[in-house]
Structure formats: structure tokens, C-alpha cells
Amino acid sequence: MKKYLFKPNSPIQDAFDRIIVMADGAHAFGAMRNGKKCGSVADFTNFSFHAVKNMTTAEGGAVTWRNHKGIDNEALYKQYMLLSLHGQTKDAFAKNHGTSWEYDVVDTQYKCNMPDVLGALGLAQLSRYDEILDKRHKMIDMYNEAFKDMNLQVLNHHDENSRSSGHLYFVRFLGKGAEFRNKFYHKMAENGVMCNVHFKPLPMLTAYKIKGFDITDYPNAYNMHKNQLTLPMNSKMSFDDAQYVIDTFKKVYAELTAEEN
């Protein structure tokens, strides 16, 4: 490698003396591999606490970073605070609990600070997140055991070296197409079980179609999408609820495959 090929454009990159590794941990809060949790591996990791996530603050998220020689953690934290509140040096709490009301706006930045009420919601969930995650994985085990002899493909959520965040439980109907999946979805809904599909490939969305993208150019994406279904799994469900999902799933599967034959 040529000397001086890497040219840092900020004091932070200069301290790292290399390209910074930033991870998208939006759905991965609590995931672990080889004893290391998501958020402790990359230099920076961004998490989402949107309403559909395992742990939610209704909206918002968090960023974590690893200790690194030459990085002042307190200064970096303050920089994030400036970025999220218009570049303002004091928030409302600090203005009313200090020795002076005086504040400054040192740069034109964003308005994306988390409201205190939502932060309190997150702290309450954080205190019991291990319990929430354990429950999700017990439901995953229930689903896995129930579907192991069926012609389905499921995502592996845990083994001896890793454990996912258990965010979604989805199945693929092997040898089936979109028509079967869509019928299955409606049959489950008729029995009181709301499923979902994750996710629709971008070339199938109008915003991308008008830019010239065509799903026929992405056969792998379509083949993964066409027969995929996501089953209910959340911390408010009971194990009896999960068993009802299983029983309904098997009943609907038997009905639809019988119709095909």
C-alpha cells in the first residue's frame, strides 16, 4: 500500500489512522456472536428504537462506539449532542438547572434529539431487555420444533456460537410461489393470525420502477421474496398465543396443499 494513500478528513479519522468501520445495527440490538454483542465490534454502531423494533422508544435510536486511543469519549458525546439539537450548547434542562441561562448555537445542525419521555420508555424496557430477548428465543424454539418436518426453510437464529436479536421469524414455502404465499396470508388472517412479508424488493416499488429498475433483472431477490411469510412474534404474546399460531399454520398449510392436489 502506498504511504499516505489514506487521507483523514476529520480529527476522528486521523486518530484511527484508517477507514472507520460503522455498523448498521438497526434490528440487531442484543445480537451476539462468539461472545461479543452487536455494538462492541465495529468502531461505531447505530441502533434503531422505532416502534417495530424489539426494544422501542416509539421513535429514535442510539449510537455506540468502542474506546480508541486518541478519541476523547466525552468530547465525542458532546459532538453528538450538538449534532442532534440544532448545534445548541445547552438543552432545556441544562438552561434551567445551571448557573446561567446563557447558551450558544455553534453550527447549523439537525433537530433529532430524543424527547425525555421517550427516553424514559426506553430505559424501562432496557432494564428487562434480557427477559424480552429470552422469551423471543423460546418462541423461536417452539416454532422451529413445530415446523422441522415441514417443507419449509427457516432462518437460523441461534447456535452454540451466536444468537440473533430474534427480531423476525419468517418461513419460506419451498417449491411454492407468490400465489400460494398470498392465499396463505389471507387464510391466516381469517383465523385471527396477522402475518407479514419482509421485505418487498426495491425494484418492485414504484419509486424505483420509475427510475428504470426491473425486478426481472434481480431473480434471486424475487425468488427469496415470492414465497416468504413472517409469523407473529412479540413480547406481548403468550406461549399459548404462539401455540395457536402453530396450530393455525399447520391447519392452513394442510388445507392449501390439499387444494393443489
Regions found by a protein language model. Give the residues of each.
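Generic detector of well-ordered alpha-helical packing
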Residues: 25-28, 60, 117
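Short, hinge-like loop/turn segments at secondary-structure boundaries
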Residues: 38-40, 63-65, 213-216
